[in-house]
Design a protein with these regions (language model features):
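Structured C-terminal portions of repeat-based eukaryotic scaffold domains
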Residues: 149-154, 162-306
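TPR-repeat structural position
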Residues: 30, 50, 70, 104, ...
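TPR repeat positional signature
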Residues: 12, 16, 36-37, 50, ...
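Internal amphipathic alpha-helical repeat/solenoid segments
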Residues: 2-6, 15-76
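Eukaryote-skewed repeat-based solenoidal scaffolds used as protein-protein interaction platforms
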Residues: 78-79, 87-205
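Conserved small-residue packing positions in alpha-helical repeats and bundles
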Residues: 16-21, 41, 54, 61, ...
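Residue signature of alpha-solenoid helical repeat architecture, marking inter-repeat boundaries
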Residues: 7-11, 28-31, 48-51, 71, ...
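Hydrophobic/aromatic side-chain positions at a characteristic register within alpha-helices
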Residues: 25, 45, 65, 99, ...
Length: 306
């Protein structure tokens, strides 16, 4: 597939713009210009030139906005944003960094402009910003991704019945903090998720949070003034009973995993690194990848303390 747009692209683009400017002779045909810009954008996509496609979709969005077609304008803005982001992702994959972040800034601008076009209580507002945040996360711009994920949470407050989606966004934020090795902030977010999940009875979230909160507590070792949730959790795992632990509605933790976590807590209290290493192997069938990573961090943390 050819990636050369040739001189025809600039000629076509200029011709469309010139037709729009002929206001003294006749009223410009906005719908026709929109279609022409859209068709030119498709040609750019086929030629694998996403920045030029983004520019053309942006012009189409302006045309739709000029005739009061808010929805049409938003759709073209979103198409523009995706093309600019595609260009940025391609540069990132090639390890090419643009100091001016031209494509990325154009993408962010188009995403935010599209977001502003949708009604305040529309779920599409949240979807647009979520898409932007996810793209930023893929690019490794974690702080910016968190910023826009938090922006999503503000939008969710005005959209009915979105609590489950809010948990998903909070989960994404917590995951980024884990990637950044900011375990204190990750612990705070998982505590928020845990509280909400218990109210909503979202069992998968409850189990994930319980394991993560315990491991993060042991890694971070926060001050006694900030450990109310963790203290109650640790108390549950400190109690030794002759009865075998069982699954229940409030704490859907597998009995064997419960015993392993109990052993982890005791191993940390006694600085038994060998026991932690053995438990890490024994627990692998019960832990998600992020929790296995936390176990490795926990072992490293206590190795440096001995």
């Amino acid at each position: 597939m050819s990636t050369d747009l040739g001189p025809e692209f600039l000629e076509k683009y200029t011709a469309i713009e010139n037709n729009l400017k002929k206001r003294f002779m006749r009223k410009p045909n906005i719908s026709e210009a929109t279609e022409e810009f859209s068709n030119l954008a498709v040609q750019c996509e086929l030629a694998e030139q996403p920045p030029f496609a983004g520019i053309c979709y942006l012009e189409a969005a302006k045309c739709e906005s000029s005739i009061g077609n808010t929805v049409g304008s938003a759709e073209y803005l979103l198409m523009s944003a995706r093309q600019f982001m595609k260009a940025e992702l391609k540069l990132s994959s090639l390890k090419c960094v643009s100091p001016g972040r031209e494509n990325l800034e154009a993408a962010i601008s188009s995403y935010l402009h599209a977001h502003s076009k949708y009604p305040e209580k529309s779920p599409l507002r949240v979807a647009v910003i979520t898409e932007l945040a996810e793209a930023l996360e893929r690019l490794g711009h974690h702080s910016e991704a968190i910023q826009y994920y938090r922006y999503c949470l503000k939008d969710y407050n005005s959209v009915p019945e979105t609590t489950g989606c809010e948990l998903n966004i909070l989960s994404k934020i917590a995951t980024i903090y884990l990637k950044k090795e900011n375990y204190a902030e990750a612990l705070k977010i998982f505590k928020i998720i845990d509280s909400a999940a218990k109210v909503l009875d979202y069992k998968p979230y409850i189990q994930r949070c319980e394991v993560n909160i315990l491991l993060l507590y042991l890694i971070v070792q926060p001050s006694p003034d900030n450990v109310t949730t963790e203290a109650n959790l640790v108390k549950r795992y400190t109690i030794v009973s002759d009865e075998e632990p069982c699954l229940n509605e409030e704490y859907p933790i597998h009995p064997e995993l419960f015993l392993h976590l109990q052993s982890v807590l005791f191993a940390c209290k006694t600085n038994d690194i060998k026991a932690l290493i053995n438990l890490n192997t024994e627990m692998k069938d019960f832990l998600a990848i992020e929790q296995m990573d936390l176990m490795h961090v926990l072992i490293e943390t206590y190795e440096t303390m001995t």
